[in-house]
Amino acid sequence: MREASELKAIASNAITGAIVGTLCAVAANVLGVQQLLRRPELALYVPAAVVGGALGVTRLRPLLWIAAGIIALLCVVIAYTPLTPALARPLIRRDSIPNRVDAIAVLAAGFTRDSLMRSETLDRLLSGLALARRGLAPVLLVSRERRSYAGHSTSDSADLHNVTALAASTTPIVFVDSVFTTRTEALRMKTMARKSGWTTLAVVTSPMHSRRACATFEAVGFKVVCVPATLRESGLHPGSNAEDRLRAFRSWLYETFATDSYRRRGWIR
């Protein structure tokens, strides 16, 4: 009878630990930890459940509750306070826009599996088209990503063409193909710039990506005018809701690690 009771207690602790571990993984995903792995198809829920279940039957199980409490508190602080806008400020670079530059560069921000631009990509493109309409540059460079899903190569090429056609821009648009990182965008555009004699670029990207992106383009030899795009639901404004602030925190977390990575590789100063 005692053995059965002990086994029941162990099973209960294991199940509780697995549940708490899974919830920790879910909350960590909301905070943006998952995207740091750069493997969107890799879910951490099962490993977290296994680790939580294993810890749940040991004397270390209080650590699960401590971790859960810290993550929960962090979620609440980020969602309901202006912490993220304060953290984001050092990552944002906004230069004065001159009367003329050699080209406008709109950087990519990913696309969906059904080959449509993500909202952030669309916002960047619209901001770039607005600058082109003002006559800031004689040409608009637009990054175009290409990825493999289920063994098939896909891109948001058709969606990009549809939106630019709707804009009816009189400025020539040049698509820069097969970019994967900010670094490859800068290198590919630099190759094109050498042939065309472009030296000064207005780089249009998301606010929190702006400082790293513009530093990357400067590192390959461009003179850069940094232009943060106008983003919907950016989470950086005083009236932002909890969902937007959490989304902004994910961007901040990613950019913080990405900036450190670029510095260590010598791609930016």
Regions found by a protein language model. Give the residues of each.
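Aromatic-rich membrane-interfacial microdomains
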Residues: 41-48, 63, 67-68, 87-91
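Short glycine-centered helix-capping/turn motifs at secondary-structure transition points
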Residues: 35, 132-135, 266
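A structural signal for short, hydrophobic/glycine-enriched beta-strand patches
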Residues: 41, 77-246
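A transmembrane-helix-recognition feature enriched in membrane-embedded lipid enzymes
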Residues: 245-269
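Transmembrane helix-loop junctions in multipass membrane proteins, especially transporters and channels
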Residues: 33, 90, 263-267
